[in-house]
């Protein structure tokens, strides 16, 4: 009996200490009131379904004036979806670290630029940044044009000659991943011609595993997670993806391992030159200089390939789908393409830069269907958040969710046509001036996506090559599409499209 009383007393004291240590979070939660969660799991039960997560957060933002505080597990979660607050967070030197929830991704795919924290992120960004410079990207155009030709042949054979309605997203993913492997790793994989479905299923499975864990607070402790079926699925898909990355890296690893002469290494580095410094060449040099380890290279390669192909193929697909659902804008795009481009053949950089309306239709699709619907940051120091009715202290350790998807659809920011596809109204010359952070498909500020120029160039070129020669249509309607929350935006069902030669 006495032992039970003593144990109960200790548990009560521990609970009171836990509450006292978090008093600053409770204070800001009182000021920025949001939904009240359950003890220990917070809003986990309400948010656990990825298929309704974005719609649920949109409903909360209408019920509570954002920014507001919610809870995921025991983590204090600041939700923002207005450009003014987003600007403050993305430009803050105290919010450059990704949210704590990204540790679930780094434990699965490695600690690369997308998931890492300072000072590791600063060091790796500085070392890898030259691989995504403008001059390097212009050297990728022959690869992009070659992959565009493969894409057109696929559309011609299956869509036109065989008359099949196509699930274009699956075709695009193979094209974009092929381009990513060639331009970052220097290796051609022929995804369109071999049985590579397991790679794409593994990438899709990995993102679903990470999101399910993020939305399930009871799986946050590693002790519990490692005994779950979700962890076993993670191990399976990670094994496939790590094998794929090792296949890409193996030739480079072998060359470096065999070349132990420092003078010979320096000579080879000078011969390669900066003009050919693609990602793998950059990191190879850093390994030879002792600035990166091969584990760093594996992590960065895994994350770079995954992020490049996932976000780019998603944005490109939604652009094509929006144009298929809105033939009037597709015809305006075609008019620009026949005016600015030759009737066939490759597209060069100068021609690509003249395609202003092409860029508009891409931006409008990324506004309506943000490739990465939500990004997370973590406050590593106390910060002051300004709102219309005053300033609020956001305590160190607060997790910050930036809801890009719903912000870019908000009628208070984008007007009455915010949930319609209308490139002219939102990005045309006569469109209203908007906050600089109202449109952030690649984020902005101190941790802007390193590959945004790469994605823009590849999307513009593929889109131009497709719609110069083909017309795409679908029976789907914009209001019928059901999106799912994921690392990159997904649809519950992918509509089929019909392809016709012009």
From Swiss-Prot:
Cofactor(s) listed: heme
CDD domains xref list: CYP313-like
Cellular localisation: Endoplasmic reticulum membrane; Microsome membrane
Keyword hit for RNA-binding: no
Principal subcellular localisation of the protein: endoplasmic reticulum
Family matches, as Pfam families: p450
Family named by the database record: Belongs to the cytochrome P450 family.
Role played: May be involved in the metabolism of insect hormones and in the breakdown of synthetic insecticides.
Protein name: Probable cytochrome P450 313b1
Source organism: Drosophila melanogaster (Fruit fly)
Gene: Cyp313b1
């Amino acid at each position: 009996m006495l032992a039970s009383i003593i144990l109960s007393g200790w548990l009560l004291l521990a609970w009171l200490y836990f509450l006292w240590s978090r008093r600053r979070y409770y204070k800001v939660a009182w000021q920025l009131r949001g939904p009240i969660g359950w003890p220990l799991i917070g809003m986990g039960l309400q948010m656990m379904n990825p298929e309704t997560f974005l719609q649920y957060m949109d409903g909360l933002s209408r019920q509570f004036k954002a920014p507001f505080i919610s809870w995921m597990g025991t983590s204090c979660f600041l939700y923002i979806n207005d450009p003014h607050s987003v600007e403050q967070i993305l430009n803050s030197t105290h919010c450059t670290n990704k949210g704590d929830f990204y540790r679930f991704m780094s434990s699965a795919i490695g600690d690369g630029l997308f998931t890492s924290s300072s000072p590791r992120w600063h060091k790796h960004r500085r070392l890898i940044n030259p691989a995504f410079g403008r001059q390097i990207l212009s050297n990728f155009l022959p690869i992009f044009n070659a992959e565009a030709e493969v894409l057109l042949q696929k559309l011609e054979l299956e869509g036109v000659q065989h008359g099949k309605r196509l699930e274009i997203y699956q075709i695009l993913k193979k094209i974009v991943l092929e381009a990513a492997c060639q331009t970052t790793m220097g290796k051609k994989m022929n995804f369109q011609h071999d049985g590579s479905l397991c790679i794409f299923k593994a990438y899709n499975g990995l993102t679903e595993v990470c999101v399910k864990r993020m939305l399930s607070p009871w799986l946050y402790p590693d002790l519990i997670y490692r005994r779950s079926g979700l962890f076993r699925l993670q191990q399976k898909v990670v094994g496939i993806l790590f094998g794929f990355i090792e296949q890409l890296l193996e030739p480079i690893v072998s060359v470096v391992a065999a070349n132990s002469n420092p003078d010979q290494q320096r000579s080879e580095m000078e011969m390669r030159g900066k003009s050919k410094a693609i990602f793998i060449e950059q990191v190879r040099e850093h390994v030879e200089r002792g600035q990166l380890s091969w584990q760093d290279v594996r992590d960065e390669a895994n994350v770079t390939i995954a992020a490049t192909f996932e976000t780019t193929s998603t944005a490109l697909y939604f652009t094509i789908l929006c144009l298929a659902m809105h033939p009037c804008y597709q015809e305006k795009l075609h008019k620009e393409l026949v005016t600015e481009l030759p009737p066939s053949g490759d597209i060069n950089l100068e021609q690509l830069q003249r395609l202003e309306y092409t860029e508009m239709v891409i931006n409008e699709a990324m506004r309506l269907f943000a490739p990465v619907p939500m990004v997370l940051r973590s406050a590593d120091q106390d910060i002051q958040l300004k709102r219309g009715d005053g300033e609020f202290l956001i305590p160190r350790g607060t997790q910050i969710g930036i809801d890009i998807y719903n912000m870019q659809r908000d009628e208070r920011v984008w007007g009455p046509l915010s949930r319609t596809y209308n490139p002219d109204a939102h990005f045309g010359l006569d469109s209203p001036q908007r906050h600089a952070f109202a449109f952030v498909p690649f984020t902005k500020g101190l941790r802007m996506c390193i590959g945004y120029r790469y994605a823009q160039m590849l999307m513009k070129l593929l889109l131009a090559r497709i719609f110069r020669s083909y017309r795409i249509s679908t029976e789907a309607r914009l209001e019928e599409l059901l999106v799912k929350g994921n690392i990159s935006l997904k649809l519950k069902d992918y509509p089929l499209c019909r392809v016709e030669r012009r």
